[in-house]
UniProtKB/Swiss-Prot annotation:
[4Fe-4S] cluster binds at C429, C435, C474, C478. GO terms for cellular component: sulfite reductase complex (NADPH). This is Sulfite reductase [NADPH] hemoprotein beta-component. Alpha(8)-beta(8). The alpha component is a flavoprotein, the beta component is a hemoprotein. GO terms for molecular function: 4 iron, 4 sulfur cluster binding; heme binding; metal ion binding; NADP binding; sulfite reductase (ferredoxin) activity; sulfite reductase (NADPH) activity. Its cofactor is siroheme; [4Fe-4S] cluster. The lineage of its organism: Bacteria, Pseudomonadati, Pseudomonadota, Gammaproteobacteria, Alteromonadales. It comes from Pseudoalteromonas translucida (strain TAC 125). Siroheme binds at C478. Transmembrane segments: none annotated. Pathway: Sulfur metabolism; hydrogen sulfide biosynthesis; hydrogen sulfide from sulfite (NADPH route): step 1/1. Binds 1 siroheme per subunit. PANTHER family: SULFITE REDUCTASE [NADPH] SUBUNIT BETA (PTHR11493:SF47), SULFITE REDUCTASE [NADPH] SUBUNIT BETA-RELATED (PTHR11493).
Length: 565
């Protein structure tokens, strides 16, 4: 804990972490309590460090209350999968568990490039962790005040460069993991081992969540500006030579609190490969010591940078690491969408990217997606890759297997030629009924909204054009609406704030356009705006660039001064 924390009142989460015996708490005791389906007191928060959130089915919460029953408590688990790579045999294991042991029967791909189980009841939690462990998966530090799942560009076309970037993502993930043995002790019946220190994270762990990426330009699939720490790959002659380091991005905010805001990351400069882990460690250590531990709403790295100054933070990282940042090397992001369909890699292998709306893999009446993915995993000899856009890549397909994979995919609705560009460029967080923070619908509303936006595009004569659109149930940032050309952020049932002005590359924060409005209001606004865009845009000008150029919303250049102005 830093000197500054000794003279301020710390948030209760700091007490909880300090008293947790390195994330053990009394979780093991709670597991045996059959009176409640949930976790009590501090354990409600501590299970997050083990990759779980306690939730309940909000659709039936009221009915259960009438019957004098507690909410239908369950947990959501988020796996740790650096770079999103999963083997077919691992996929088959998670498919079976989702089918047999979860309330919803689905696998949910997320913007954190991993999968989630939703609706796991208390008696099944320990078995879930043991199953995952048996196939080489865990959920350590995918939630809580730690470094979360490390993202990496899923770029199987440039196989050698991607492999190097992925290996760095995995190394960073391992280096920044909590060292406590609490996870193995509680869930895997591991031998108890006393923990006396956390050399990187500290005994109180981090002030708030911390997110890291490794990305290969020109693809910004991982949305670097949504993350605390980013390593942007710099290559020469196809070989990775180092990274530009971007620090201080983040999208979460609180409605009505102007001291909170989304923020882009700052470019600290270039480092050669050999300094990667050292820089990762000391960006984390500076945030550990300097981050706000009294107000969790202002605890993330982005606020630390704005409070102490970017140059001061950067200099402290250099001092601790014994490394000076060189001038940033040139790079450019040009897009961030996934290349849906087949592509051939430089190694001659083929890769099929499957569009999965909102990442929800389930057997629908007309699209048995889950069965299709299972059948692919049963025959596929390469690997599978989850993308930060909630899609799934069947990677490393030999030429003689292409037809087999494609037939399975088409027969199960995993390839649908009717999917429009607008549908592919729209995304939603989970929201209702499972997320306790959701103020409005997101995933369940997205298909309907997309159809209405598609109709407006067709009305104005551009059915093949699209707008990067994201819908989220609350302002916490999971669906990355604050980097969309058009972002809808839930404010209440059926009501959203509408933000406009992001760009295709994901390098601009949008600005509030409409506040707390219903569908009739924002669809009328989109009707007018799309008409203007079609009639008045420059050649190739995207929707987000258009609304900035025309002054429909002001450009957010410096978030702390511009976002709420």
């Amino acid at each position: 804990m830093s000197e500054q924390d000794k003279n301020v009142k710390l948030s209760d989460n700091e007490r909880m972490k300090r008293e947790s015996n390195f994330l053990r708490g009394t979780i093991a005791t709670d597991l045996k309590d059959e009176i409640t389906g949930g976790f009590t007191a501090d354990n409600f928060q501590l299970i997050r460090f083990h990759g779980m959130y306690q939730q309940d089915d909000r659709d039936i919460r009221g009915e259960r209350a009438k019957q004098k029953l507690e909410p239908l408590h369950n947990v959501m688990l988020r796996a740790r999968m650096p770079g999103g790579i999963i083997k077919p045999e691992q996929w088959l294991a998670i498919d079976k568990f989702a089918e047999e042991k979860t309330s919803y029967g689905s696998i949910r791909l997320t913007t954190r490039q991993t999968f989630q189980f939703h609706g796991v009841l208390k008696p099944n939690i320990k078995g879930m962790h043991q199953l995952l462990d048996s196939v080489g998966i865990d959920s350590i530090a995918t939630a809580g005040d730690v470094n979360r799942n490390v993202l990496c560009t899923t770029n199987p076309v440039e196989s050698e460069l991607h492999q190097e970037a992925y290996e760095w993502a995995a190394k960073i993930s391992e280096h920044l993991l909590p060292k406590t043995k609490a996870y193995a002790e509680i869930w895997l019946n591991g031998e108890k081992a006393e923990t006396t220190e956390e050399p990187i994270l500290g005994s109180n762990y981090l002030p708030r969540k911390f997110k890291t990426t490794v990305t290969i330009p020109p693809n910004n699939e991982v949305d670097v500006h949504a993350n605390d720490l980013n390593f942007v790959a710099i290559a020469e002659n196809g070989k990775l030579i180092g990274f530009n380091v971007l620090v201080g991005g983040g999208l979460a905010m609180t409605h009505g609190d102007t001291a909170t805001y989304p923020r882009k990351a700052d470019d600290f400069g270039f480092i050669p490969l050999e300094h990667t882990l050292k820089i990762a460690e000391h960006v984390v250590s500076v945030q550990r010591d300097w981050g706000n531990r009294s107000n969790r709403k202002n605890a993330k790295t982005k606020y630390t940078l704005d409070r102490v100054g970017v140059d001061v933070f950067k200099a402290e990282v250099e001092k601790r690491a014994g490394v000076e940042f060189a001038s940033s090397r040139p790079y450019k992001f040009t897009h961030r969408g996934d290349r849906i369909g087949w592509v051939e890699g430089i190694d001659g292998k083929h890769h099929l990217t499957l569009f999965i709306q909102s990442g929800r893999i389930l057997d629908y009446p007309d699209k048995p997606l889950k069965t299709g993915c299972r059948k692919i995993a049963e025959v596929h000899q390469g690997d599978m890759r989850m993308t930060a856009n909630q899609n799934l890549i069947i990677a490393g397909v030999a030429a003689n297997q292409k037809a087999v994979i494609e037939e399975i995919a088409r027969n199960h609705g995993l390839i649908d030629d009717k999917d429009t560009e607008q549908r592919k460029n729209s995304m939603a967080c989970v929201a209702l009924p499972t997320c306790p923070l959701a103020m409005a619908e997101a995933e369940r509303y997205l298909p309907s909204l997309v159809e209405k936006i598609e109709a407006l595009l067709a009305k104005h004569g551009v059915p093949n054009d699209s707008i990067i659109m994201r819908v989220v149930g609350c302002p916490n940032g999971c669906g990355r609406a604050m980097l969309a050309e058009a972002g809808l952020v839930g404010k209440g049932p059926g009501k959203y704030n509408v933000y406009l002005g992001g760009n295709l590359e994901g390098t601009r924060i949008p600005k509030l356009y409409l506040e707390n409005v219903g569908e009739d209001v924002y669809l009328a606004a989109f009707d007018e705006l799309i008409g203007q865009w079609v009639n008045e845009r420059n050649d190739g000008e995207c929707f987000g660039d258009f609304v900035i150029r025309k002054g429909i919303v002001a450009e957010v250049k410096v978030s702390v001064t511009d976002f709420h102005a």
